[in-house]
């Protein structure tokens, strides 16, 4: 198994595009920077994809975004499954909603055409299958038609089927009352000096700035060796020994072994899952998201460059002094 040397990314997403010219044309991709990627697909900057380069389909709009992937590899797995729900091994054969009725020249099943209904149903199904059901994902809708298709599908799901877990985040942002250049790029109205606040993909945080205070707290605790006793098992924690995670809440300096946090979060879990989602901090009694804790932990262990940039630290550089002989 390959060794991971990078922290959990600030943002990595799987997106769904729809042509504003031909609404029956869709494209699924993944990116850490949705605004830049949309510009590439629309030919505004270099890049994009062959399938979105046809001028008679541009401009494209990002109608749905799934964020929260812990790595590019994780996002690519989800992207492939969403693009190929008729083939994906993540979906049990008996639960497939999309079935191919034709084959390509190489004999492989041909990818069925997409529609809003098929995209919404496949997305809902993937969020429920065991492979992805406990991932810390958030689904964002930037288009009313797409959200209506999602709600219609959710309303039709039978009670006997696996539903989405309660902690799933589903967000809508339709940019009411603004003039958009596509999926949230806001233009100033005539006679106005400043444009309204951005919405949609242009309002997404692309860096670690939202967790700056949390990261700073963790740095201070471990730099000054203030970790103390584990908030779960009460054992004294030694600096530099083991993996220690910090409570996400402001004002709480609760620290614990990662294994203890995990065991505490899973103690009331009756599904046999091994991946925690949420739990209560024993010190402050507030709800803590496992994904946020792991993002800070990986930044602390594997993201010194990112931490220095976030906290505006000057990195120490080794300098070589020439010796005069």
Curated annotation (Swiss-Prot):
ATP-binding recorded as keyword: no
Highest taxon in the source lineage: Eukaryota
CDD domains membership: GIY-YIG_SLX1 (cd10455), RING-H2 (cd16448)
Primary location: nucleus
Lineage: Eukaryota, Fungi, Dikarya, Ascomycota, Pezizomycotina
ZnF endpoints (SLX1-type): 230-284
A Pfam family annotated for this UniProt entry: SLX1_C
InterPro entries in alphabetical order: GIY-YIG_endonuc (IPR000305), GIY-YIG_endonuc_sf (IPR035901), Slx1 (IPR027520), SLX1_C (IPR048749), SLX1_endonuclease (IPR050381), Znf_RING/FYVE/PHD (IPR013083)
EC number: 3.1.-.-
Subunit and partners: Forms a heterodimer with SLX4.
Organism: Chaetomium globosum (strain ATCC 6205 / CBS 148.51 / DSM 1962 / NBRC 6347 / NRRL 1970)
Role, per record: Catalytic subunit of the SLX1-SLX4 structure-specific endonuclease that resolves DNA secondary structures generated during DNA repair and recombination. Has endonuclease activity towards branched DNA substrates, introducing single-strand cuts in duplex DNA close to junctions with ss-DNA.
GO molecular function: 5'-flap endonuclease activity; crossover junction DNA endonuclease activity; zinc ion binding
Keywords: DNA damage, DNA recombination, DNA repair, Endonuclease, Hydrolase, Metal-binding, Nuclease, Nucleus, Zinc, Zinc-finger
Co-factor requirement: a divalent metal cation
Family of this protein: Belongs to the SLX1 family.
GO biological-process terms attached to the record: double-strand break repair via homologous recombination
PANTHER family found in the cross-reference section: STRUCTURE-SPECIFIC ENDONUCLEASE SUBUNIT SLX1
Domain (GIY-YIG): residue spans on this chain: 10-92
Enzyme class, spelled out: hydrolase
Gene name per UniProt: SLX1
A single GO cellular-component term on record: Slx1-Slx4 complex
Keyword set includes Nuclease: yes
Subcellular location: Nucleus
Protein name, entry field: Structure-specific endonuclease subunit SLX1
